[in-house]
Amino acid sequence: MAKFTKTHEWAELGSAVTMGISKYAADELGDIVYISLPEVGQAVVAGEPMCEVESVKAVSEINAPVTGTVVEVNTDLEDSPELINEDAMSAWICKIEATDIPADLMTEAEYDAMDK
């Protein structure tokens, strides 16, 4: 079951944490035309920017939902960033080997109830 951040990233917790941006974030951005994926081996810190997504409206930073090391990236997004608009919850950005998982990640119900 996915957990969510206040900055609209989702994280599927497991042996590696799979992450992406929420449907709300994708809808707010509009048509996504480019994503700068993080690099495998890149250290990331929960709540800190790890990559960027560019839409027809804006360029936005994507924050890491957990602290750890990127172990895999979804290279399909390099050629088809619009996959995020089509199904944000399936179009994962990367997988992170987590060393710290913040306690303030929200359930889907908590995220849906949050003022956006």
Residue ranges of each PLM-predicted region?
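Generic hydrophobic/packing signal
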Residues: 66, 74, 97-100
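Short, surface-exposed secondary-structure boundary micro-motifs
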Residues: 49, 55-56, 75
